[in-house]
């Protein structure tokens, strides 16, 4: 036999919000989905917490009533084979760079230390945009010293300009030889948007194959 990777069954409260509700974004089955499952450490997920992340095939979508509330059960299969074959993503565990929240300006805060050292083997970025009112670009910045002036764009770690008024999701691969400095943080460049609600994660490649 061989090992398999899957988030299993995700459960949520049924939400029929027109553009960003659970029903809208998860009711289509038998397709590959970008999945991020942040794990809060004794609290709601926050920057620096682990994230189970990857592209997985959605197997179903089931709405059930319990105690007067409606819940959705969403089973996922293994990591999408076509995704694994076309990208060099070797593990599903990353770190949360930005927990789901609305932002209205660029980031000048310090970042997180996700590994304790710089690396030189790239990685991949995963993002979810839940709401917004125009176009914007989300990026990851890195730094060797955890101070605002030291941060600069991590080459390749960008969504490109997106229309954030609709739900957006995706994965961005860095080159396999991309140097990644020790500290990481999110960055937001607003174009026509004045607010964007998003989540952002990064998986750093530590050694070849892991």
Q: Language-model segments: which ranges?
A:
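Surface-exposed ligand/attachment interfaces on beta-rich extracellular proteins
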Residues: 1, 17-20, 98-119, 130-139, ...
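Extracellular Ig-like/FN3 beta-sandwich strand-entry sites
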Residues: 5, 32-36, 120-122, 135, ...
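Short beta-strand and beta-hairpin "edge-sheet" elements
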Residues: 37-86, 178-179
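Predominantly extracellular/luminal cell-surface or secreted proteins
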Residues: 40-42, 139-146, 189, 203
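Surface-exposed beta-loop interaction hotspot
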Residues: 80-109
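A short beta-strand element within beta-rich, extracytoplasmic domains
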Residues: 119-131, 184-188
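Short, surface-exposed tryptophan/glycine-enriched loops
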Residues: 167-181
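C-terminal interaction-tip segments
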Residues: 189-210
């Amino acid at each position: 036999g061989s090992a398999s990777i899957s988030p299993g069954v995700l459960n949520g409260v049924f939400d029929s919000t027109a553009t960003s509700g659970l029903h809208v974004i998860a009711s289509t089955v038998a397709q590959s989905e970008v999945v991020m499952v942040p794990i809060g450490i004794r609290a709601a997920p926050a920057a620096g917490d682990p994230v189970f992340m990857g592209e997985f095939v959605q197997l179903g979508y089931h709405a059930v009533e319990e105690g007067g509330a409606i819940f959705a059960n969403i089973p996922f299969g293994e990591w999408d084979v076509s995704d694994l074959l076309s990208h060099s993503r070797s593990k599903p565990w990353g770190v949360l760079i930005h927990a789901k929240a609305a932002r209205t300006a660029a980031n000048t805060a310090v970042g997180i230390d996700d590994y304790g050292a710089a690396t030189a083997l790239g990685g991949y970025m995963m993002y979810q945009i839940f709401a917004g009112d125009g176009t914007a670009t989300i990026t990851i910045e890195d730094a060797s010293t955890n101070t605002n002036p030291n941060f600069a764009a991590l080459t390749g770690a960008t969504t490109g300009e997106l229309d954030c008024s609709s739900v957006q999701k995706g994965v961005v691969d860095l080159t396999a030889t991309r140097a990644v400095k020790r500290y990481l943080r999110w960055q937001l460049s607003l174009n026509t948007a004045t607010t964007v609600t998003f989540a952002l994660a990064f998986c750093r490649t530590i050694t070849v194959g892991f």
